[in-house]
């Protein structure tokens, strides 16, 4: 009597294997495009603020959308550099854009954190 085929145990929920190549119809392998996201950085900030708190993949997707949206809005304020006949957006233009885009207290916190980050960066050079 033939032995029943051994089946592999089902992978644990949430575990994902990195697939770098996908099989094409004609047998050739092609590289799968990489999706860029801010999830690594969002996770690092979360652990700095609340070390014992986790985040779901759905919430991470929302945070990624939020960061992309804010980035696009700040980049959209490039007219601030254009007014001064400049082709480069400096930290000053970004600061002004943040003040225009974010409401009240949120803008104040964002500006202070941004200033702190720029100061840390320039002092490390």
Curated annotation (Swiss-Prot):
N6-methylated lysine found at: 116
Sites carrying sugar chains: 112
GO cellular component: nucleoplasm; nucleosome
UniProt PTM: Monoubiquitination at Lys-35 (H2BK34Ub) by the MSL1/MSL2 dimer is required for histone H3 'Lys-4' (H3K4me) and 'Lys-79' (H3K79me) methylation and transcription activation at specific gene loci, such as HOXA9 and MEIS1 loci. Similarly, monoubiquitination at Lys-120 (H2BK120Ub) by the RNF20/40 complex gives a specific tag for epigenetic transcriptional activation and is also prerequisite for histone H3 'Lys-4' and 'Lys-79' methylation. It also functions cooperatively with the FACT dimer to stimulate elongation by RNA polymerase II. Phosphorylated on Ser-15 (H2BS14ph) by STK4/MST1 during apoptosis; which facilitates apoptotic chromatin condensation. Also phosphorylated on Ser-15 in response to DNA double strand breaks (DSBs), and in correlation with somatic hypermutation and immunoglobulin class-switch recombination. Phosphorylation at Ser-37 (H2BS36ph) by AMPK in response to stress promotes transcription.
Modified residues (N6-crotonyllysine): 6, 12-13, 16-17, 21, 24, 35
Modified residues (ADP-ribosylserine): 7
Modified residues (N6-(2-hydroxyisobutyryl)lysine): 6, 13, 21, 24-25, 35, 44, 47, 58, 85, 108, 116, 120
Entry-annotated residues carrying PolyADP-ribosyl glutamic acid: 36
A single GO molecular function term of this UniProt record: structural constituent of chromatin
Modified residues annotated as N6,N6-dimethyllysine in this record: 58
Annotated positions of the N6-butyryllysine modification: 6, 21
Cysteine disulfide links: none
CDD domains attached to this UniProt entry: HFD_H2B (cd22910)
Modified residues (N6-(beta-hydroxybutyryl)lysine): 6, 12, 21, 35, 116
Oligomeric and partner information: The nucleosome is a histone octamer containing two molecules each of H2A, H2B, H3 and H4 assembled in one H3-H4 heterotetramer and two H2A-H2B heterodimers. The octamer wraps approximately 147 bp of DNA.
Protein name: Histone H2B type 1
């Amino acid at each position: 009597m033939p032995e029943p085929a051994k089946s592999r145990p089902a992978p644990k929920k949430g575990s994902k294997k990195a697939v770098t190549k996908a099989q094409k119809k004609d047998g050739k392998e092609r590289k799968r495009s990489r999706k860029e996201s801010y999830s690594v950085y969002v996770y690092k900030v979360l652990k700095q603020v609340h070390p014992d708190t986790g985040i779901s993949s759905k919430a991470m997707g929302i945070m990624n959308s939020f960061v992309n949206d804010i980035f696009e809005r700040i980049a959209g304020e490039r007219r601030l550099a254009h007014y001064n006949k400049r082709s480069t957006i400096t930290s000053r233009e970004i600061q002004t854009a943040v003040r225009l885009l974010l409401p009240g207290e949120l803008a104040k916190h964002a500006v202070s954190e941004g200033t702190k980050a720029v100061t840390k960066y320039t002092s490390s050079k």
